Amino acid sequence: MIKKATLLTAFSVTAFSAWAQDTSPDTLVVTANRFQQPRSAVLAPVTIVTRQDIERWQSTSVNDVLRRLPGVDIAQSGGAGQNSSIFIRGTNSSHVLVLIDGVRLNLAGVSGSADLSQFPVSLVQRIEYIRGPRSAIYGSDAIGGVVNIITTRDNPGTELTAGWGSNSYQNYDISTQQQLGENTRATLIGDYEYTKGFDVVAKGGTGMQAQPDRDGFLSKTLYGALEHTFSDRWSGFVRGYGYDNRTDYDAYYSPGSPLIDTRKLYSQSWDAGLRFNGERIQSQLVSSYSHSKDYNYDPHYGRYDTSATLDEMKQYNVQWTNSVVVGHGNVGAGVDWQKQTTTPGTGYVPEGYDQRNTGVYLTGLQQLGDFTLEAAARSDDNSQFGRHGTWQTSAGWEFIEGYRFIASYGTSYKAPNLGQLYGYYGNPNLNPEKSKQWEGAFEGLTAGVSWRISGYRNDINDMIDYDDHLQKYYNEGKARIKGIEATANFDTGPLTHTVSYDYVDARNAITDTPLPRRSKQMAKYQLDWDVYDFDWGVTYQYLGSRYDSDYSAYPYRTVKMGGVSLWDLTVAYPVTSHLTVRGKIANLFDKDYETVYGYQTAGREYTLSGSYTF
């Protein structure tokens, strides 16, 4: 970790009087520019979620955490473990870069988009969420934003947790962190989660085979980490985790053919790193390996039957990141190397393929009086489509003490996935999707209210669409996204309020029709308070209407799904200094709604849990 005093000196954050009041570790951000900096110095909109937030919200999935955040819209085909799409500021789910401890999520390489319905929430210790373009820093996918899930734990001791709930939900978790001598720390986490689920396919003509069954989810997770401090300036770590998930779902059925309605996912990841932390220079070298095997099969025949499908991918990464204090700011530079290897049949690609990418980036941030300037540039050399460059720049002006205006522009891109390149309908001549984004924002601190209002536009060209007539993928799509985002947080006595509002006009720029499964308006509100040691929380979420396709009709038709207001209620009580009991009612008023046409949501659900620390 970079020493806090060094950071404060480097950025002279005392100039930002409205935003520099809190200097706790939770206000330091690494994801925005790939070097640690106070959140007040980040010009892009950023949200930080801590483990304490997740426990207070009593979230049982990563999707439940993310749906509370500004700009995030999630469409899911049912309940726990079912396929989901994350839309940030109206962009495609493939335009969201998901990192695990700064490393690209392995499963995104197969489909081209990250589905976090399978990732265990028990591993999440912190989330850094950046909105807007970040390809100039991270490369492909970072068009709508970046979600960095951090698993590093900083909570010595042992915690046992057990929970039960609706639909036969069960969760058992043990985590421990212990010192092994003066300079070594070990962490171990084990987690088991199970739910019988519910029948995810909605009743009525949806084009699906009627399967009146429960679609359950089972997940087993193991995590281990070892950290060692060699000296005041040198430290290192090694960690690994794996999870074994089984998901039941409803699928299309053809008479005389096996019914493929079960998913089995094995995933493991390992990484090791070495850090140097000088007074003015910081450097980190990280090497990682991940391997996933994703089966879809008929349980009557098993996952090794010829009717089953297997998506198998190995991913190798090496990252070298550096930053140096220059003037009143930092300059960062680094190299990313990645290799993805697939087996034959993965993503319906007949042959196995290797894809390599080497990226070189440069970032800089300077504070000049009342102005903060930020810029980044990156060049990627890909074994498939060659070299591609991106850049971005931002400027912030504190025109009155406590009030700042921010303007930014950035380019970003999305590389074609393996299925689009080499699948049965693939096109090896595809080019990356390209984006240009503009944003203007005001932020300030007024009468104890910390607020930000942003307006943005995103033009995406060369989008990869499937051509029904030519039966191939081509770069023929365009999207135009305009939006307004407003956020605020404040306290009134014992009450803590967090509010956000999003207006997103995401359209196909060729046909001028709305992009599917996105709400045009979203409003979110979180209220927390303590009364006589009871920690209460109320969550409100309004999701506006959205459009989707009805495939039960031929040709398929576009349907409009209405908006919905959802309420959650949580409470926690510390029975002793070691034992805490928690309860939650999700979807308090049992609203019936869909985010994917034809797929039901859970309705009202109850959970009760307890945790014991020692």
From Swiss-Prot:
Q: Where does cyanocob(III)alamin bind?
A: 85, 92, 110-111, 251, 309, 517, 551
Motif position, TonB C-terminal box: 597-614
Is Signal set as a keyword in this record?
A: yes
Gene Ontology annotations for the cellular component aspect, listed alphabetically: cell outer membrane; pore complex
Which residues pair up as cystines? none
Membrane topology, from the record: Multi-pass membrane protein
* Classification via InterPro entries: B12_transptr_BtuB, Plug_dom, Plug_dom_sf, TonB-dep_rcpt-like, TonB-dep_rcpt_b-brl, TonB_box_CS, TonB_rcpt_b-brl_sf, TonB_rcpt_CS
Q: Where is this motif: TonB box?
A: 26-33
What Pfam families does the entry give?
Plug, TonB_dep_Rec_b-barrel
Recall the GO molecular function terms of this protein's record: ABC-type vitamin B12 transporter activity; metal ion binding; porin activity
The TBDR plug domain extends over 38-152
- Classification via SUPFAM superfamilies: Porins
Q: Where does Ca(2+) 2 bind?
A: 213, 215, 249-250, 261
Q: Where in the cell is it found?
A: Cell outer membrane
Please provide the record's keywords in A-Z order.
Calcium, Cell outer membrane, Ion transport, Membrane, Metal-binding, Porin, Signal, TonB box, Transmembrane, Transmembrane beta strand, Transport
Residue ranges spanning the membrane: these are 158-165, 169-178, 184-195, 217-227, 232-248, 263-277, 279-296, 309-325, 328-337, 353-369, 371-381, 385-400, 403-417, 434-443, 449-458, 473-490, 494-509, 517-529, 535-550, 558-572, 585-596, 602-614
Signal peptide coordinates: 1-20
Q: Name one GO biological process term.
A: monoatomic ion transport
Quick one: which residues bind Ca(2+) 1?
A: 199, 211, 213, 215, 250
TBDR beta-barrel domain: residues covered: 155-614
PROSITE patterns referenced in this protein's UniProt entry, alphabetically? TONB_DEPENDENT_REC_1, TONB_DEPENDENT_REC_2, TONB_DEPENDENT_REC_3
Family, according to the entry, reads as follows: Belongs to the TonB-dependent receptor family. BtuB (TC 1.B.14.3.1) subfamily.
- Protein task: Involved in the active translocation of vitamin B12 (cyanocobalamin) across the outer membrane to the periplasmic space. It derives its energy for transport by interacting with the trans-periplasmic membrane protein TonB.
The protein, known as: Vitamin B12 transporter BtuB
